[in-house]
Amino acid sequence: MTSTRDSQDDLPVLVQQNHSPGVLTLTLNRPNQYNALSEDMLAALQRALDEIAGRDDLKVLILAANGKAFCAGHDLKQMRAHPDKHYYESLFATCSQMMLTLTKIPQIVIAKVHGMATAAGCQLVANADLAIASQDARFAVSGVNLGLFCSTP
């Protein structure tokens, strides 16, 4: 099991686990923030996906999450702390690259969804090859209420 730490909370934002040969689980691990995609989380996902893409021994990638939610989308608190155009352009370019990588890796990607999956969190699910949702799973793109629209792949 490996993890990448969040500089804000010093918690592992992403946990990797091999449960059986050929299957790897990446678990989003910012449960107190509903697994919002912080800069650290996006970077950790990109690094993990780049590494996974080159592994012939892995056939299946499961995206999971700890806590009450799968993923609340971008970290709005972090976004509000940087209210300038260049920050948003960089953030969305980073997210777009990660989402594109997710769609292009050779492994089958399964999103294991519980709780809410909103905005970019809903995009994570949409970019998976297959989604398995619990009875309590909820999907939304509520950013339109803030003048935002999810436009990455």
Please place each PLM-identified region on the residue numbering:
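CoA-thioester-processing core
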Residues: M98-K104, K112, T118-P153
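Hydrophobic/aromatic residues within transmembrane alpha-helices
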Residues: L26, L63, D75, L124-A126
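Hydrophobic alpha-helical membrane-association signature
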Residues: M41-L45, L91-T94, L124
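Conserved CoA-thioester-binding segment of acyl-CoA-metabolizing enzymes
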Residues: M1-N66, H82, L100
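Glycine- (often His-adjacent) and acidic-residue-rich active-site loop
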Residues: R5, A65-L100, A117, G147
